[in-house]
A protein has these predicted regions:
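Domain-level signal for soluble alpha/beta catalytic cores
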Residues: 1-475, 479-825
Length: 825
């Protein structure tokens, strides 16, 4: 009997921490924990047995850091040897105890994926595939993907597990105290992604204790329709005598976990700092308990890496402008591979009110598959809005869905059997919400009854694949009233009936209604209002159209979707709407915080589009805006123009630094996410390169700032955080000496002394490597007492940083920049 069959109404119990027990058994600072699978197998077998005897149902293989990046041809042991030994040790413990399941443990690679980092998505899938195959060969009963801080890497690991095994897949992520992943994801976005990918259970582990996890767990349970797993740390860490200890004892830990079960959690265990005693008391508490029934949720969620759009009562605006149909400039941009043009269209639509962006790059003379894949990646680097993948080419659709970081809206499927046969397997494999067109082999029915019949057929076929109605959005189809006088009425009737009879969400390409008519925006905007009143939940429109956006905000105010008419008032102020008529300003500004489908606050003025690319704005403004929005080519071009009339330092201090500061403050406030922060830094870097070349050719003296040493400490290969800090510090003109990862204390001290560095930054992700960080600080205090030390990493807190002797705890990259500005004066 497998774990799926055995679970039923049981509460599953995972084991607890591994690293702290290995430290207690003699693991040295900087020593790789996975090597003990081979060097000290008896220790691993004993730890596994202790957890099983304590009452754990599931033990984790000691493979958290096992991947080819760490165990390559230069390592003491290769990857297969490490995983084979780990699985053998775990299986031996299960045989000795006569019970239990072995989970193949997959941890993060320690690298950021492109476009934020340098690791290709398919390479990440390949890295995890190697471990999965070895784990399956070694007898794993399930796969646990844990401690993931990036939804993109999480997706790569899940795909590797799905495509190379039929084992149950559990996936847990590591959130910060504000309920965010490193790359900006929320519990809601994680649930949408993982349920779409079809994992068996999802949850949270590490980083926080059970008290700090509670609000995050509540959010996971609010949206999850599958079991939720919670594996907290034993509270918050501190250092005592060179070892990491935690502030919650086993009885207190179990009392907090009791509350988790009452909330509806289905599986519990421990992470850093928990021991067999924690698990023993946890198992005793769980005796006689059954897990609460899981209530299926009916939320239609579309996500990016960070943002979630929920379809329902509040209409969703889908920007239509990234589409070559009828757009000669867009077609030429595709032919010329001018991606910046496409990115500007995206940013303009976001600022003018779009909540989702349609992406269509179909042009006969280009490679649509390659272009779609590239455009999706580039768009996700500059905007956090979810995307609608719009293509009839199933290969392009699959490539886009595979590379997409989130749960996409897919446009589209229809009632033709061959189309359903091609599209539904992709929706099932990659997850997504699919637009369903009410057309089949016979064409578009002239009646609402005919379109409803197709909608029902599509829903029935989708059910065969396990695709629920909540992930189907019905398009009732707009027929132009110039040729079909009753077309609008049929469409509106179909929209109403879909909502009432099927309970599905609805979508329309609104502007089709007016094709061939004069003053189309008048017809479009009035039909848009009628459609929203009929139950339309999403509209593909031009958000740069003032008439359409006025209809949108007016409807929301009238339908009591806009509390105190706040969004309408803000939008009216942006546009200075005349008292009568639809004339006047041609733009549309986004309004402030609204319902789940309403756009986020924007900054476009009455011109109807952002200032990007505007001939009216000068190069100074262009440079500032380009840096803020991560447009590399435009930033470089604007910098070059400014240097014709301005000296280099003025360009840097008047344009570049204020823009970086603005983005940094947005990141600290949670309104800007990590990909945007990094792309802003990349845009600044491209402008700096132009400025640097100008300075070298003219002999102009540049601004020199202090050297800073950065390193990930001995034994730790996870240098994502350190690399992010490096990018930002360099953009603030600091000279960063990046020593890399797995760096010995002696090497850090040597570089600090040799360059008389006044600030050292140390990073660690794993609890087992924090003692190495503490040792590094001790050596710096002795050999380079003038140097300040800032520390960061998922396992650290302010108290912990104080205890190991650091001068500053920096919770994120901007905090590191701020501290550098304080001490390096």
């Amino acid at each position: 009997m497998g774990i799926r069959e055995d679970w039923n109404d049981k509460i599953l119990i995972f084991d607890g921490g591994m690293g702290s027990l290995l430290q207690g058994a003699g693991l040295k600072p900087g020593e790789l924990p996975e090597t003990w699978n081979i060097k000290h197998p008896e220790v691993l077998v004993k730890i596994h047995e202790d957890y099983l005897n304590a009452g754990a149902n599931i033990i984790l293989s000691n493979t958290f850091g096992a991947n080819r990046l760490k165990y390559n041809e230069t390592a003491e042991f290769n990857l297969d040897e490490i995983v084979d030994a780990a699985m053998k040790n775990a299986r031996t413990a299960v045989e000795h105890c006569g019970r239990g399941y072995v989970a193949l443990d997959l941890g993060p690679t320690g690298r950021l994926l492109k476009p934020m980092g340098d690791l290709d998505f398919e390479e990440a899938v390949s890295i995890y595939t190697e471990v999965v195959k070895a784990g399956v060969r070694g007898g794993a009963d399930l796969i646990l993907i844990e401690t993931m801080s990036d939804t993109y890497e999480l997706k790569a690991a899940v795909l590797a597990a799905k495509e190379n095994s039929d084992l149950p897949i559990f996936a847990t992520t590591i959130f910060d105290g504000k309920g965010k992943l490193l790359t900006g994801g929320t519990p809601k976005s994680v649930v949408a992604l993982l349920e779409g990918l079809g994992v068996d259970a999802l949850g949270i582990n590490c980083g926080l204790g059970p008290v700090q996890m509670k609000p995050i767990v509540e959010e996971l349970l609010r949206y999850a329709s599958i079991p939720v797993v919670v594996n907290p740390n034993a509270g918050l860490p501190r250092s005592e005598g060179g070892k990491t200890v935690y502030d919650i004892d086993p009885p207190e830990f179990v009392e907090e976990m009791k509350g988790m079960l009452e909330m509806g959690v289905s599986a519990v265990g421990g992470c850093c700092g928990t021991t067999p005693e924690h698990i023993r008391l946890l198992a005793e508490m769980c005796k006689g308990r059954t897990r609460k029934p899981i209530e299926p949720k009916n939320d239609t969620l579309i996500t990016s890496y960070a943002s979630v759009v929920e379809m329902g009562t509040d209409p969703v605006i889908i920007g239509e402008r990234i589409n070559p149909t009828g757009k000669s400039k867009f077609k030429q941009a595709l032919r010329d591979h001018n991606l910046e043009y496409i990115l500007r269209e995206a940013i303009t639509q976001q600022e003018n009110g779009a909540a989702v962006l349609d992406v269509n790059v179909g042009l006969p003379e280009i490679d649509e598959v390659a272009m779609m894949r590239e455009v999706v990646q580039e768009l996700q680097a500059v905007t956090e809005l979810p995307l609608q993948i719009d293509t009839t080419d199933t290969e392009a659709m699959e490539q886009a869905l595979r590379i997409y970081n989130g749960k996409a809206l897919i446009n589209s499927v229809n009632g033709k059997q061959e189309v359903m046969d091609a599209v539904f397997p992709l929706v099932k494999h990659y997850g997504g919400t699919v637009v369903a067109l009410t057309i089949d082999e016979e064409g578009i029915p002239a009646t609402a009854d005919g379109r409803m019949a197709i909608a029902r057929k599509i829903c029935a076929e989708a059910e065969k694949y396990g695709i629920q109605k909540k992930d189907i959005v019905i398009d009732a189809l707009c027929m132009t009233i110039s040729s079909e006088p009753t077309g609008a009425l049929v469409t509106l009737e179909t929209v109403r009936r879909v909502r009432q009879e099927l309970g599905c969400n609805t979508i329309l390409g609104v502007s089709n209604i007016s094709f061939g008519l004069p003053q189309r925006e008048i017809v479009n905007s009035n039909f848009f209002t009628m459609a929203m009143q009929s139950g339309l939940t999403a509209a593909i429109i031009n958000p740069n159209s003032a008439a359409m956006m006025r209809s949108y905000y007016s409807y929301r105010a009238l339908a009591a979707l806009d509390e105190h008419c706040g969004d309408y008032i803000e939008q009216a102020a942006r546009l200075a709407i005349p008292k009568a008529g639809v004339g006047g300003a041609s733009g549309a500004g986004a309004a402030g915080s609204a319902g789940s489908g309403a756009p986020a606050a924007g900054a476009a003025g009455a011109s109807g589009s952002a200032d990007i690319g505007s001939q009216a704005s000068g190069p100074e403004h262009q440079l500032t805006v380009s840096v803020e929005r991560g447009l590399k080519e435009q930033a470089a071009s604007a910098a070059g123009e400014l240097l014709k009339t301005m000296d280099s330092l003025t360009v840097i201090n008047s344009c570049m630094i204020p823009a970086l500061d603005k983005v940094g403050k947005g990141f600290e406030a949670g309104t800007v996410f990590l990909p945007q922060l990094l792309m802003s830094a990349e845009a600044a870097k491209s402008a700096f390169e132009v400025i640097k070349n100008q300075m070298e050719s003219s002999g102009e003296a540049g601004e020199k700032k202090d050297k800073i040493v950065l390193a990930t400490v001995k034994g730790d290969i996870h240098d994502i955080g350190k690399n992010i800090v490096k990018v930002l510090l360099e953009n603030y003109s600091y000279d960063v000496l990046d020593l890399g990862k797995d760096v010995a204390p002696e090497s850090i001290v040597e570089e600090t002394i040799k360059n008389h560095v006044r600030l050292v930054g140390l990073s660690a992700l794993m609890t087992t490597t924090v003692p190495s960080m503490e040792e590094t600080i001790k050596q710096l205090r002795k050999e380079a007492p003038w140097a300040k030390v800032m520390v960061g990493g998922a396992v650290l807190t302010q108290e912990y940083a104080d205890m190991i002797g650091a001068d500053a705890y920096c919770r994120d990259a901007m905090a590191s920049v701020n501290y550098a500005q304080q001490v390096l004066v």
